[in-house]
Amino acid sequence: MTVQHEIKSQLAKLLATEDILVEHKKVETAEFNVQTRVLTLPMWEKASNGVIDMLVGHEVGHALYTPNTEWWKEVQIPQQFVNVVEDARIEKLIKRRYEGLNKTFYNAYHELSDKDFFDIENKDMSDFNLADRVNFCLLYTSPSPRDSALSRMPSSA
């Protein structure tokens, strides 16, 4: 199914509750610049609408909840760890705000896992740096019994 860029742009603006600039480019991954308020979405050939919706939800989470400061420099926390924790934090918050995104995130991460998008199949986790291992742990852990929205991946992954 073809991704309709204008529809995804409007979705992002509606979820963000502001007139952010949405760009569709041939880039490796999605990103949101908290200073310029620009959301960049990748133009992946084989990305489903569900995966793009998840990327929109994730990046809008940054638009809504990531502060426009570099506070971690003052406390000397490596940025790779800040990124991992911030991604988990904003995903939890965006899914609380828009409860319908729970299923979108679940299905999209399941699809990415099935396609080995993260290129981890048949790899030894001990070869990855600590921040990546923490991120994969957050992605691949089963949901908490009290809050299924805490996990970003299906428990079967």
Which residue ranges define each predicted feature?
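Basic/hydrophobic alpha-helical interface regions
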Residues: 1-126, 135-139
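Hydrophobic alpha-helical segments, chiefly the membrane-spanning helices
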Residues: 152-155
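Short hydrophobic/aromatic residue motifs in ordered secondary structure
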Residues: 61, 147-150
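Conserved small/polar residues in nucleotide/adenosyl-binding loops
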Residues: 140-147
